[in-house]
Amino acid sequence: MRHKSGEKQLKRYLGKTIPKNIERLKIEFLLEFYHNQWDPHIQMIYQKYQKESKTIPMSIKIQNFENFGIYFTYNTQKIEGSKLTQEDTKDLLIHGITPNKKSKIDTIETLKHYDLFVTLVNSELKKITLDTILNWHKEIFGQTKIGESGSIRTYNVGIPGNDKIEFCAVPQIKPKLKKLLNLLDKYDGKITPVELACIVHYEFVNIHPFGDGNGRITRLLVNYILLKYNYPLMLIQNKDRKAYFKSLERSQLEDNSIHFLKWFMKYYIKNNKKYL
């Protein structure tokens, strides 16, 4: 078995006959290959970010998080179809100027998302429970998705135009969510927090616990995890939306997280290249 990317190559002898668990071995082999590429970069990013953080006063750190929150809110909203421009978003969140002739729903959800993000970065980072997730959803969508905000969906959902991808059936939503949150709670450091955030993102989207708003909640989860373990936060930009969704969809179609993991880790490293 052999895998090559650029100048990097990894080989493994499996014997004269193909093992019965060949598919699992392939995944483990690929993960080993990519960990050898990612982990040194992630470690360096973490170390240099920590060193930088020690020189920044807490008041400036909070200000930096709040500034990040503006761009994070704009992009996470835009990915989901918001019509507010970046300037609209900045005017709304910095100056309190409501955009003219723009969707009231987009405006409310933008404000609520930003307020929640700022609250999170200014609060003690607690254990994430099912109630945490439901409360986040209610905070953002309480005024725009009345009757559904803060509640697990009671109907099956899929992707319009793609009947090959099915999200979690209703009876399995809560058990799978609790299993995922338990994985998060029992994190043992064997993988980096960045990879943990990616896995949580992938699994949460596959569960798809809400009728709408899953993407925004999962991207909040990603940054909550990174914040908790003192890593640089993750900004997935709207301009990269196509590649983001394509990698996620490929993993869903093949029931193999490796494709999304590759995209996510490379994207995170690229976004933090100033620390390399």
Regions found by a protein language model. Name each.
Residues R2-D212, R216-L276:
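FIC/Doc superfamily catalytic core
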